[in-house]
């Protein structure tokens, strides 16, 4: 418990210098923390040790008595709380959904993770997507797939970058955007989602003029396209997408301003929840989220455009969402039960003292 308090203090102080996401990964989501050359247990390992310690409590023969039932219930609630926290830490995900008025969306974009999408746009009726997740986007990694008749070699992954126009002609090996621009690496921002990642890669073994070195970055206004053996491909670096079994259509976005200011007081999104052909109208407001199929949609922010407004919904999937509520109720029951067993003895001792 004392070491957990130290971790909370260190992680809280570190947020000022390294940002929330990096501090969380270093102190709370890690198994081991290195203090210079000394390894120490991280947040996950510490909580596992505490959980094991709590579980061993139930193997004590002396506790299985009626008069200690409240303590047993209390410890069971604590184990349940830690189990729910483990589920949240290991399997929960969060991102956002950006929808313009009148448009629909069926995917969530991750705040931190990226993916490389290679889209075959040759067919008239559909596009074929081949996705490579961020763990594969590292230096000297060779990307192959049965859907692709070429190879992509990752030359460099830039955590944060900006494009800059070339001051001298590029060599013949540079293709696409890199013929006119370079990607300059920048110092990463404290907050991870403020970064603009970039990728420098090489296309190999096409047997065509498409072989060469390319560059792309997050939010690139003109997508990188390439034609290889009569097939057209679009290559995009984007935030990792999670596709949902339903769609959300934004009907109307409303915001209320503080009187006499341009500062929003509250805002809401009137949406259609579309699933298997069925349409249900829902209003998402601040502090009144939509919960559906394990996902929770919060009204996060908005984007004002010249002709329409765009809503930004924060989306969370938390498998351990109910555990804090359930475990808190169980622990309260355990405490009340324990107090109800102890109060008669306390009253009796008080009466004996008064009598004396």
Regions of interest found by a model, annotated:
Residues 348-356:
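Cytoplasmic C-terminal tails of single-pass
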Residues 3-4, 24-28, 44, 87, ...:
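Long, intrinsically disordered, low-complexity accessory segments associated with secretion
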Residues 4-5, 84, 299-302, 334:
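Short hydrophobic alpha-helical segments that form membrane-spanning helices or hydrophobic packing faces
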Residues 3-11, 50-57, 61, 67, ...:
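A broadly tuned "polar low-complexity/structure-edge" signature
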Residues 40-124, 312, 316-349:
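Internal alpha-helical transmembrane segments
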Residues 1-63:
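Membrane-embedded alpha-helical segments of integral membrane proteins
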Residues 2, 48, 69-72, 76, ...:
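Active-site-proximal structural scaffolding
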Residues 91, 95-318:
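Soluble non-transmembrane domains of integral membrane proteins
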């Amino acid at each position: 418990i004392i070491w957990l308090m130290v971790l909370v203090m260190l992680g809280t102080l570190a947020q000022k210098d390294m940002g929330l996401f990096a501090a969380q990964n270093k102190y709370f989501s890690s198994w081991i923390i290195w203090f210079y050359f000394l390894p120490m247990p991280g947040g996950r390992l510490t909580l596992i040790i505490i959980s094991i310690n709590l579980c061993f409590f139930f193997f004590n023969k002396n506790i299985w008595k009626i008069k200690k039932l409240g303590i047993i219930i209390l410890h069971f609630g604590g184990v349940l709380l830690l189990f729910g926290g483990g589920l949240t830490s290991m399997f929960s995900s969060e991102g956002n959904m950006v929808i313009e008025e009148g448009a629909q969306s069926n995917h969530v974009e991750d705040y931190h993770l990226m993916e490389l999408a290679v889209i075959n746009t040759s067919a008239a009726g559909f596009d074929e997507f081949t996705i490579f997740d961020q763990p594969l986007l590292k230096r000297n990694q060779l990307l192959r797939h049965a859907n692709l008749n070429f190879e992509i070699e990752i030359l460099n992954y830039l955590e944060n970058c900006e494009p800059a126009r070339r001051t001298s002609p590029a060599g013949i090996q540079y293709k696409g955007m890199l013929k006119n621009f370079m990607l300059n690496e920048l110092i990463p921002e404290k907050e991870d989602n403020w970064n603009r990642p970039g990728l420098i890669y090489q296309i190999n073994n096409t047997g065509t003029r498409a072989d060469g070195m390319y560059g792309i970055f997050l939010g690139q206004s003109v997508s990188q396209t390439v034609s290889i053996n009569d097939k057209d491909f679009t290559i995009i670096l984007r935030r990792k997408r999670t596709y949902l079994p339903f769609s959300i259509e934004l009907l109307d976005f409303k915001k209320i301003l503080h009187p006499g200011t341009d500062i929003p007081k509250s805002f809401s999104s009137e949406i259609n929840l579309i699933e298997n052909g069925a349409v249900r109208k829902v209003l998402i407001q601040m502090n009144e989220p939509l919960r559906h199929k394990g996902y929770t949609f919060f009204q996060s922010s908005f984007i004002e455009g010249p002709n329409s407004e765009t809503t930004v919904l924060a989306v969370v999937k938390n498998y351990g969402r109910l555990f804090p509520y359930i475990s808190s109720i169980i622990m309260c029951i355990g405490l009340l039960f324990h107090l109800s067993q102890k109060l008669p003895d306390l009253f009796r001792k008080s009466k004996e003292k008064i009598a004396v």
